[in-house]
Design a protein with these regions (language model features):
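Metallocofactor- and cofactor-centric catalytic cores in central/energy metabolism, strongly enriched
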Residues: 1-267
């Protein structure tokens, strides 16, 4: 009875159910960006209020499909505004992303792999590990970090390791060092995962059995346990080689607009 009352199938009408689920998924991403921006000092009362309004609609049986459709579309617009808010937070702290060559190979030193999209956590780890004799690699959503001037200045931000988030089982095994999740996209590890005791989470991310790094009363996060663990690990196993180009943010793209148009006209 409880499942029928609170589960997804509590909504009998298929269209209404689908709209509520679509709205829920949109609000999840929206909330993640708002939380991340707030952590970096940028908030919007208007966007926060919309998040509450949208969530209320997902559980209000009196909201009709026309209203739900409008809310789904509005969530897209508000999501774009949340992205702009987060972009402001990131660029105010770390500068505008610029064209950057990122290594996808590996070095000889042990490493820490950082996933998610919280740039402040990455910066804190880079500062704490700068003289530790280890390298820091980005994974998945953290790849764009290499384009920010305020982060690429750290020489031990070595490169990017791995591909899509769903390849974690294979790539975390071959990385051989600690992994830090700063936001979501955690794939539950298989029972025999050799890397499970090396995974850490922080912020809103978390998973049963993974050690979590909380901030102290001053908001400082101590990543020394990852750094010390990394020192005892082997260097990453190479799965790729070469470089990739990143940094095509809106500011950089606007600077390249004229050369791009000229190249198009020239064929």
């Amino acid at each position: 009875a409880a499942q029928a009352e609170i589960g997804v199938l509590r909504t009998g009408d298929i269209d209404s159910r689908s709209l509520r689920e679509l709205l829920t998924y949109g609000l999840k991403g929206f909330a993640a960006y708002l939380h991340h921006a707030a952590e970096l000092g940028e908030e919007s009362a208007v966007l926060n209020a919309y998040l509450v309004r949208g969530l209320v609609a997902t559980v209000d049986s009196q909201v009709d499909n026309t209203t739900l459709t409008a809310l789904v579309l509005e969530t897209g617009a508000k999501g774009l505004a949340a992205m702009a808010l987060l972009d402001t937070a990131n660029t105010n702290l770390y500068g505008h992303p610029e064209l950057t060559q990122v290594s996808i190979g590996v070095g000889e030193r042990p490493g820490i792999l950082v996933s998610g999209h919280d740039l402040a956590d990455l910066e804190a780890l880079l500062i704490q590990s700068k003289d530790a004799g280890i390298d820091v690699y980005t994974h998945s959503e953290m790849l764009p970090a290499h384009g920010y001037p305020g982060l690429k200045k750290y020489p031990h931000l070595y490169g990017n390791y791995g591909n899509a988030w769903w390849k974690q089982h294979q790539e975390f095994t071959s990385f051989r060092g600690p992994i830090l999740f700063t936001t979501n996209c955690i794939v539950p590890p298989p029972s025999n995962a050799v890397y499970a005791n090396k995974v850490f989470t922080t912020g809103a991310a978390g998973f049963p059995g993974y050690r979590h790094i909380d901030p102290d009363s001053d908001g400082h996060k101590d990543f020394s346990v990852l750094i010390e663990l990394a020192k005892s690990c082997q260097s990453p196993e190479a799965i790729e080689d070469g470089t990739i180009t990143i940094g095509f943010g809106h500011n950089q793209a606007s600077q390249l607009a004229q050369p791009i148009l000229e190249a198009i006209h020239e064929g």
